[in-house]
Amino acid sequence: MERLIKLAEQIKDEELRKKVIEFLKNPKATHPGIVDTGISVEEAPASINWHHRYEGGLIEHTISVTKIALKMADVLEEVYGVEVNRDYIIAGALLHDIMKPYNYIRKEDGTFDHYDMFNLDHLTLAVAELYKRDFPIEVIKIVASHHGDHSPTRPNSIEAYIVHYADEADSKINDVAVRVCQARSRDLGISEQEIYKAVNPLKVYEVRSREGKLKTIEFLKDILKSIGIISEDEKKDENNESLENKESN
């Protein structure tokens, strides 16, 4: 959470900065009908079946989206000479998924799932809470439209498009990475979540894209062995089996 607050402190407008920091520190739904599932922003994944689907994924995704969006703002100003409101970008990016924890529960095995009693979706909850907390309409529109054409309202400002495409870029690249981790977890006969405890999925994808499948398996075995997730005997058995596999994924 401190990393999110540090980004929020870059907001120049004092009133907006205070509102964003307060929301980050107290991301609770005001309406009494919204069920608190007990999942914090710090522990929540960013999704269940897609990108950042591991503990801490939501914060990781939020930081990345905010930083990507600010870099995009730099490029658009430098190349096209437009003025971009960075305060709105930071606020919208930091808060775009802030209510996702209300859609998740933690299962007995420690993994996450959707809350089956169904709170409102995270976008609806966020927009409602932003209205309740009297945020600027420009920030509300950024959050409301961050899914682009799949949002209830489409982006209608440079800032809204920046946040939307920053969100999409980070989501897409992480989704590719977690699918590689999913495949390698099957190769290793372990839970996909065990990989995420040991190494960031983008690092796994980096190894996969540069060195191939077999090197990725070896990379993961070494890391997993070092933290006790697999034993030396398991590593030897898997080494022998891997040598028989063809480079196919």
UniProtKB/Swiss-Prot annotation:
It catalyses: 7,8-dihydroneopterin 2',3'-cyclic phosphate + H2O = 7,8-dihydroneopterin 3'-phosphate + H(+); 7,8-dihydroneopterin 2',3'-cyclic phosphate + H2O = 7,8-dihydroneopterin 2'-phosphate + H(+). CDD domains: HDc (cd00077). Its EC number is 3.1.4.56. Pathway: Cofactor biosynthesis; 5,6,7,8-tetrahydromethanopterin biosynthesis. GO terms for molecular function: GTP cyclohydrolase IV activity; metal ion binding. It comes from the Archaea. PROSITE patterns: HD (PS51831). The keyword Kinase does not apply. InterPro entries: HD/PDEase_dom, HD_domain, HDIG_dom, YhaM_exoribonuc/phosphodiest. Cyclic phosphodiesterase that hydrolyzes the cyclic phosphate of 7,8-dihydroneopterin 2',3'-cyclic phosphate (H2N-cP) and converts it to a mixture of 7,8-dihydroneopterin 2'-phosphate (H2N-2'P) and 7,8-dihydroneopterin 3'-phosphate (H2N-3'P). Is also able to utilize other phosphodiesters as substrates in vitro: hydrolysis of bis-pNPP and pNPPC produces nitrophenyl phosphate, and that of 2',3'-cAMP produces 3'-AMP. ATP, 3',5'-cAMP, GTP, 3',5'-cGMP, and 4',5'-cFMN cannot serve as substrates. This is Dihydroneopterin 2',3'-cyclic phosphate phosphodiesterase. It comes from Methanocaldococcus jannaschii (strain ATCC 43067 / DSM 2661 / JAL-1 / JCM 10045 / NBRC 100440) (Methanococcus jannaschii). The gene is mptB.
